Structure formats: C-alpha cells, structure tokens
C-alpha cells in the first residue's frame, strides 16, 4: 500500500510538472501574439505554433561552405529541354526582383517583412524549357543536402533564387552566396547554398523529408512532420 501511495504521488508530481511546462509554453505563444496586437501587427500573419522574432536564428546541418571568387555556380537540369549552368555574375545579370515577405522556420520562429533580391525561379525554368511531364523540383545544395518542392510552388511570383537579403549580399551563415526562397512553405524548403535545381516527374523525398519531415510543409497547416 505504501508503494502504491508513493507511486501515485510520483505520478501526480510528474503530471503537475508537465502541466506547468505546457502552461508556460502556451503562455509564451499567447504573450507573443498579444505583443503583435499591441504593435498593431496582424496576428493572422503568424502561423499556429509559431512565435515572432526580430532576430534571424541560424540553424543548419554541417559546415558553412566558403567559395573563392568565381567558384560558385548554379545548374538547371532534369526534365528540361536545354540544361544550363550559370556563374554568380551571370545570375546577377538576369532581370531581378526585390520582394518583401514573412518567413517561417519549422523550429517555430517566424520573421516578418524580410526583403530579398534575386531571380524568379520560373524565369530560369523558362530559359531551360520545362518538359510537360514535370511535377516537382529537387533543390540540391552543398554537402549533399536536398529538399523537394512541387513545381507549382517554386514557380510562383514570390519564389526566387536569392543573392541579397535586406539590400546586402546574403551572409554565408544565412545561405550565401545564393539560396532559394519559397516563402509560403516552412523555410527548410528554401535551401541554403543551393547549387542546382533538378526538375522531376514525381515527388521524391529530400534530406529532411527522409528523416521525418513533411513532404510539403505548409506552416499554416503545421505540416512539420510525417503524418501532420
């Protein structure tokens, strides 16, 4: 009877601890949304389970690559009529856009009103001639990192191959010299240090997708992991 009583006390103690932690976590997100409203910001811009930060957290796997001048290039290939490779100077010589949008990381932070400059992915694909059977794109980055995106999502007005952030070259820690930006999906779908875009006729899991992350990654549906 004593053992049972002790077990009940221990169990109830664990339950209280979990409850308190959950309450603190919920309160943090609630406070963050209240702060948005106090600043006159539209809280509906913040996906569920996210918090707003003014910082730009750095999260990645592996080392940060470095490039000698002229070393970086981007290849466009797969199911296209005319594959090609661009140097950084050639990429920057193409018609560019400067766009401002919110970004959302799967690790729960969001950052509003980020400004990026680059070339629309759809313009690069127009140069290559995407074959009619194409449905998806694999982003290939340094060190073998990959992530998959539907063709329709990476060819919107907002999806770009970016080389500037807030008016300056993208810092290496944030994916420079060039990264993808697909702002309406969780930000792991916007590969840092991108080196090639491969057009596919099917959906193929990339690095994180093979390791439990969602194949699509809509932040407003909280599609973080398999089954979400």
What are the language-model segments listed below?
Residues 21-228:
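Structured, non-membrane catalytic/scaffold regions adjacent to prosthetic-group chemistry
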């Amino acid at each position: 009877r004593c053992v049972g009583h002790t077990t009940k006390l221990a169990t109830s103690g664990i339950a209280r601890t979990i409850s308190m932690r959950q309450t603190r976590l919920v309160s943090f997100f609630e406070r963050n949304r209240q702060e948005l409203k106090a600043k006159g910001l539209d809280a509906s811009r913040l996906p569920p389970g996210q918090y707003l930060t003014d910082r730009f957290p750095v999260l990645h796997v592996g080392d940060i690559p470095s490039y000698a001048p002229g070393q970086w290039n981007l290849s466009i290939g797969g199911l296209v009529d005319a594959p090609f490779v661009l140097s950084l100077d050639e990429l920057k010589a193409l018609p560019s856009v400067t766009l401002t949008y919110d970004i959302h990381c799967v690790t729960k932070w969001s950052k509003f009103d980020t400004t990026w400059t680059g070339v629309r992915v759809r313009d690069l694909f127009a140069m290559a001639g995407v074959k009619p059977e194409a449905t998806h794109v694999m982003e290939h980055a340094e060190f073998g990192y990959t992530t998959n995106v539907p063709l329709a999502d990476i060819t919107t007005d907002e999806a770009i191959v970016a080389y500037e952030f807030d008016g300056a070259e993208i810092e290496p820690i944030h994916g420079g010299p060039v990264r993808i930006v697909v702002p309406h999906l969780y930000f792991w779908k916007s590969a840092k240090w991108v080196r090639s875009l491969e057009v596919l006729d099917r959906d193929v899991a990339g690095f994180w997708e093979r390791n439990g992350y969602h194949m699509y990654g809509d932040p407003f549906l909280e599609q973080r992991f398999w089954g979400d």
